[in-house]
């Protein structure tokens, strides 16, 4: 299984499955992610299984993608200037497309779906009037996490009628996400002994979902192609196995709580539709994508901050339905 390099400056990946990766091959990503209606005899389409039927006879299409990113941050903290800069270089996708029979094509892809990478701190300052923390002093909470979710897709595309194709694909999601918090108290009274508390959460994901798609080309000539396409991802509960442990002191000392549960973590139902126009030199694509994150996801995240008794405080994580428009233009002066 491919493992993404951990990028530790994305605090919002503390929640759920983390940050979604932009889907598609390099060509689609350079077009703003548009490509639901893209139909080509030379490019693998990762967004719509109906495009698999475009694979020409006696031809095998293979795609391998890499992704590099540069991060730079400069800020002033307490009057002191600080800078951070680093590069990442990761595998992004492997995909192929091949004909099975006349007007029937097979497609396969292995791509990262989401990734987690963060490290942050929270300070609870000493308050002499606080009935709980008055004799403890300052407390520092450290949060960090890393992991990823990978998607494997296998599908068939069929052209039952001229210029009209349908497709179906099975999607397998798997991965591991690890989240850790450490509470470190600092005694200021010289009385009592206080030890660190370590919490570890592991999310193990393994689930199968599905996707269907259609494409229709009302204009298909030697000089130009106009295609309309749509795809629907069924989504559903990933049903991850979650192992939670809390230790006092360190991982070699007493386990306060350890259990394994199944947490509800739902991928949204996704509807996407688009239009794609191609000539020898130009390509223009427009997509609309709707995801119902808010209709099916509810989650309670634990903070690691002490509440009443042995419990940790918690808060609700809000998910919102999203609508996304993607537009891309490509110009190739001399394609052949």
Predicted regions and their residues:
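N-terminal, post-signal peptide beta-strand-biased segments of exported outer-membrane/organellar beta-barrel
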Residues: 4, 8-114, 321
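Outer-membrane beta-barrel porins/channels
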Residues: 8-30, 95-336
């Amino acid at each position: 299984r491919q493992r993404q390099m951990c990028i530790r400056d994305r605090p919002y990946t503390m929640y759920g499955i983390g940050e979604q990766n932009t889907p598609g091959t390099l060509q689609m990503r350079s077009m703003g992610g548009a490509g639901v209606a893209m139909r080509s005899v030379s490019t693998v389409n990762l967004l719509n299984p109906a495009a698999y039927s475009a694979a020409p006879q006696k031809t095998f299409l293979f795609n391998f993608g890499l992704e590099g990113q540069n991060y730079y941050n400069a800020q002033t903290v307490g009057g002191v200037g600080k800078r951070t800069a680093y590069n990442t270089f990761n595998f992004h996708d492997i995909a192929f497309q091949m004909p099975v029979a006349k007007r029937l094509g097979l497609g396969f892809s292995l791509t990262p779906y989401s990734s987690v990478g963060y490290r942050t701190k929270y300070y609870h300052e000493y308050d002499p009037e606080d009935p709980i923390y008055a004799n403890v002093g300052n407390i520092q909470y450290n949060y960090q996490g890393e992991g990823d979710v990978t998607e494997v897709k296998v599908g068939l595309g069929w052209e039952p009628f001229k210029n009209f194709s349908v497709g179906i694909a099975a999607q397998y999601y798997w991965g591991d996400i690890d989240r850790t918090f450490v509470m470190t108290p600092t005694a200021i009274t010289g009385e009592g002994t206080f030890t660190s508390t370590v919490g570890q959460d592991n999310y193990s994901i393994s689930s199968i979902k599905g996707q269907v798609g259609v494409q229709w080309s009302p204009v298909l000539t030697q000089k130009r192609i106009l295609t309309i396409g749509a795809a629907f991802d069924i989504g559903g509960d990933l049903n991850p196995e979650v192992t939670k442990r809390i230790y006092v002191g360190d991982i070699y000392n007493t386990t306060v709580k350890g259990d394994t549960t199944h947490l509800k973590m739902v991928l949204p139902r996704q509807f996407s539709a688009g239009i794609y126009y191609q000539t020898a030199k130009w390509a223009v694509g427009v997509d609309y994508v709707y995801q119902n994150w808010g209709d099916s996801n509810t989650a309670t995240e634990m903070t690691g901050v002490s509440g009443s008794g042995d419990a940790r405080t918690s808060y609700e994580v809000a998910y919102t339905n999203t609508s996304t428009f993607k537009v891309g233009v490509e110009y190739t002066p001399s394609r052949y």
